[in-house]
């Protein structure tokens, strides 16, 4: 996670008019990058406290967990995610959060509590972690991001 965020931050700083779209863990990362670099983002069912999620998912007996030949998830990485957690959302006016209450992986209420009152949050009943009908939301997401860049 540290290297991924470091590389993304460096790339963002080299480019003009960057916007982010992050889903699940990507939503957690995007929240960090918005706070650090003030870039706009659309978050789709963002993971809250992903270190808990991964530890619950894999358990101590399965860590380190080999994701693929190039990446292994271990306790040090999960500890890092916990250390960088932001106690409150920053630059919230640059964040659109899309939640679906039928998310079978994450508890949408955690994200709703964290972002509500700060960022623009749209919470739909039903749905799933993959964000049902996402294609229908693309025009709204693009309009939000475009407005943020003006």
Which residues make up each language-model segment?
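Active-site catalytic motif of lipid deacylating hydrolases and related acyltransferases
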Residues: 1-14, 129
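Short acidic/histidine-rich motifs immediately flanking catalytic phosphotransfer sites
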Residues: 15-19
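Gly/Ala-rich beta-loop-alpha elbow adjacent to hydrolase catalytic centers
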Residues: 21-26, 30
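Aromatic pocket-lining residues of Rossmann-like dinucleotide-binding sites
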Residues: 33-37
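The alpha/beta-hydrolase serine catalytic core
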Residues: 40-148
């Amino acid at each position: 996670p540290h290297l991924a965020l470091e590389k993304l931050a460096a790339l963002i700083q080299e480019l003009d008019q960057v916007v982010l779209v992050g889903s699940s863990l990507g939503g957690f990362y995007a929240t960090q990058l918005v706070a650090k670099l003030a870039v706009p983002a659309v978050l789709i069912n963002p993971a809250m406290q992903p270190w808990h999620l991964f530890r619950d998912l894999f358990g101590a007996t399965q860590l380190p967990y080999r994701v693929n030949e190039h990446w292994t998830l271990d306790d040090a990485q999960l500890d890092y995610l916990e250390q960088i957690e932001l106690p409150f959302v920053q630059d919230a006016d640059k964040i659109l959060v899309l939640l679906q209450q039928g998310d079978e992986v994450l508890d949408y209420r955690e994200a709703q509590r964290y972002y509500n009152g700060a960022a623009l949050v749209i919470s739909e009943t039903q749905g799933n972690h993959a964000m049902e009908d996402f294609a229908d939301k693309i025009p709204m997401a693009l309009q939000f991001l475009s407005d943020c860049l003006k």
